[in-house]
Amino acid sequence: MIMTMMQTVRAWQQESDVEHRKQHKQRWRPDGAHISAAYDLNSDNDDGHHRVVHNQNNGSPNSSPNQSTSAFRQRQPHHPPTGQQPPRLPCTVTHFSAHWKTLLILLTLLSASTLTASANVTSTISPPINGSSTDYILLYGESTTSLVPALTTGLSGDGSGAVIEDEEDAEKASEYIFDRTDVRIIFITLYTLVFCCCFFGNLLVILVVTLSRRLRSITNFFLANLAFADFCVGLFCVMQNLSIYLIESWVFGEFLCRMYQFVHSLSYTASIFILVVICMERYFAIVHPITCKQILTAARLRMVIVTVWITSAVYSTPKFVFSKTIKNIHTQDGQEEEICVLDREMFNSKLLDMINFVLLYVMPLLVMTVLYSKIAIALWRSSRGLTPHVVQHQHQQPQQPSCQDIGMGMHNSMYHHHPHHHHHHHQHHQLQSAASSAGVVGVGLGGGGGGGPGPSLASGGSSTTSLSRKQSSKYEKRGVSITESQLDNCKVSLEADRPIVSACRKTSFYHHGHAHHQRAGNASVGGGSGGAGAGATHMSHSSSNVLRARRGVVRMLIIFVLTFALCNLPYHARKMWQYWSRSYRGDSNFNALLTPLTFLVTYFNSGVNPLLYAFLSRNFRKGMKELLLCSWKKGKGKSSSNSSMHHKRKALQTHSLPTDTTHIGNEQL
């Protein structure tokens, strides 16, 4: 097009030069005199003839006044020497007139070519309908709605802005990366795996926590809400996000488009907020157990969960308001295509994404890093004194452990609700005082009393002792009931609590067995030197388990923080690159693949949460196994459970000592 315009202008310039040479001619005579001639432009000389005015006065040209109005006369320069070429004529008004005409014609052609090129680009280049919603800008005219890509793919890749005229090049430039079969297979496989983790994994967590009586606690209540939020991510976000890139048109309607954007933001936001709440609950339960008992009651924790969901819903409301479906009629086959996008002209997209980056990534990551670091430091420091020598010294001079020391031993404090819990609260403290007077304290797990449920270890451990025959007959039934409650509490503990629970159970069984072998009839347990030596052996073994467990908790906390940071970083990094870097190209194949991959990694965090927070617990795995096998082992399991409880009660009443306390202590977890 530009070459055609240049050739046309050059032809017009040549015609103008010919016309100018016709109007101004200069003829030289052999004697050196010159003749100035001009064509008369009057209507009298339409035949093309011209008048020649001879000048004989020293060779200088002269024009008649009568002809000045009807003919154009050019004053000639002096006669040049013989043998030299005559000088060029200076530019005249006719030259300016011809140039102005040329400029006007050139400007007209340029404007016409610009309009034609823009019309061709608008009509021939259609946006990739399967692209991400972030790569579109919605332009609303007075009567029509057009959808234009943020970076037009119809331009050449060198950035020069030249329009692709070759049809073959245009087809290559408009080829969509997700139309390739291998790319489709890879993404369908990856999205299916993430969907299965999010859907089935979190659904299993919800069922196990809800149906298993042993897992009904406040901490698991948080995990169940986290699993529900991640379950919504798998149900409403994963496959819908994949469909944007694979199908040609949104077929679910405008309302479901709004609901998709709303639920996508709601579940993602609630999942992050619940992770922060779980982190805060663990911090108070481990580092400040007494404060946790006073502040984090069951009613308040339920209000916290309700507040999290309401806040997430309010925060996600703009996604419901600004979402809509857009019809694209500029397709090659003439069919209408519909996509679900956010109307980014109704709000500041950059500002909203920056707020999401701060509230949903930076602040949660900072809070979890600080609190989990404090938990790790507290557990690591408390593990320094857990050596056999120190434990033996503490056993020889027994003293009741503090709430903070016990709280540090439980990285996941559990909250329990027993029907007889508050009824036996007074007798529970009587037994504690009796055990303290006897000089022996077990590392038991007691339920919290008072105004609400509290941490099991933070409320003071219930001591397991053998009283005198007279006192034992009075509290025998209640004492057995409390011991069974302790065993149930031990079962609810998570994986990292196993060493301390083992110590609890070993100490309890040891004291009962030692009382059975004591034939002197004394009322206290472990008062003799033999009891101290045996107790030191058991406590030395349990202290090493506690040390390993606490260091394992530190490693697990690091995994929690790193998982959240790594899974959510790619999405926010891509957003920051899109807004703050000039090298970002939304039309490139790399970015076309990068966008769904960042979503996929974010969804993977919702799929891996149940693996980290639930499946690492042996107690949870037992509850899951019971849930899966309860259909055909229901009767057998019930009979075996009753028989086991009968033998357990008989063993406690007869004060018999099991032969392998380590096996029994670990079997319950």
From Swiss-Prot:
Record's keyword terms, sorted: Cell membrane, Disulfide bond, G-protein coupled receptor, Glycoprotein, Membrane, Receptor, Transducer, Transmembrane, Transmembrane helix
SS bonds (residue pairs): C257-C340
Entries under InterPro entries matching the protein: GPCR_Rhodpsn, GPCR_Rhodpsn_7TM
BP-aspect Gene Ontology terms: cellular response to hormone stimulus; G protein-coupled receptor signaling pathway
Compositional bias of kind Basic residues: 414-429
Cytoplasmic face of the membrane: 206-217, 291-302, 372-552, 617-669
Descriptive protein name: Trissin receptor
Species whose genome carries this gene: Drosophila melanogaster
Organism lineage string: Eukaryota, Metazoa, Ecdysozoa, Arthropoda, Hexapoda
Chain's gene name: TrissinR
